[in-house]
Amino acid sequence: MNKKIQLQDLGNRDYKSTWEYQEELFQDIVDLKIKNRREELDLPTSNYLLFVEHPHVYTLGKSGDLENLLLNEKQLEAKGAAFYKINRGGDITYHGPGQIVGYPILDLENFFTDIHKYLRLLEESMILTLAEYGLESGRSEGETGVWLGVGTPFARKICAMGVRASRWVTMHGFALNVNVDLGYFDNIIPCGIRGKGVTSLNVELGVEKVDEDEVKSKIIKHLTHLFEAEIV
């Protein structure tokens, strides 16, 4: 079992080329697993964690409802935002500057074969990261992701999640709002959930800007511990 996760920080990169890159890495792992099984080999499979910041883009999961996008094509263009219907779980979400997007592309057979546990550990890494900033966050029953003010009328989402898995290989991942322009969420019903707000780390801390590299290092620390991995 290979518990090393290769970290790649892609910086600012458009959604489409990043999605294609994810698919390449994902398919390479799947292909090697098929080869291992067919030829009775035991070649180690790779694991990756991609960090990226996307230009303005809305993405809709495979079970999502297009009605949760409140803009037409011309309005999207006017906002300089792209739109993609993609192959992850979940509904609609927004990605943009000031948001830390993480795509773990893992062979879960290197760790554990349990998608539910995988999602809960991704959430836990965010909960622990936010706790380091003095914020109490948690899960909202039946709604994947991480929230503040759970169980109150002021529940607000700070981290969205949506993944795809096949043959125990994962792709897509999480999006943590750090210094993001929350106005872009007004153009969607985030994750198809009505009546709940969206927030970001800088808003919750009452500061203009949070150091995103510092946040990433905390996420890496917690993922390393939770997955008993080595992130290199």
Swiss-Prot record:
Class of enzymatic activity (EC top level): transferase
Involved pathway(s): Protein modification; protein lipoylation via endogenous pathway; protein N(6)-(lipoyl)lysine from octanoyl-[acyl-carrier-protein]: step 1/2
MF term (GO), any: lipoyl(octanoyl) transferase activity
Any one annotated GO CC term: cytoplasm
Superkingdom, natural source: Bacteria
Sites annotated Lowers pKa of active site Cys: K157
Chief place of localization: cytoplasm
Location relative to the cell: Cytoplasm
Claim: Transferase is one of the keywords in the record: yes
Keyword Plastid found: no
Assigned protein family: Belongs to the LipB family.
Function: Catalyzes the transfer of endogenously produced octanoic acid from octanoyl-acyl-carrier-protein onto the lipoyl domains of lipoate-dependent enzymes. Lipoyl-ACP can also act as a substrate although octanoyl-ACP is likely to be the physiological substrate.
Name assigned to this protein: Octanoyltransferase
Species in which this protein is naturally found: Flavobacterium johnsoniae (strain ATCC 17061 / DSM 2064 / JCM 8514 / BCRC 14874 / CCUG 350202 / NBRC 14942 / NCIMB 11054 / UW101) (Cytophaga johnsonae)
Taxonomic lineage of the native organism: Bacteria, Pseudomonadati, Bacteroidota, Flavobacteriia, Flavobacteriales
Record gene name: lipB
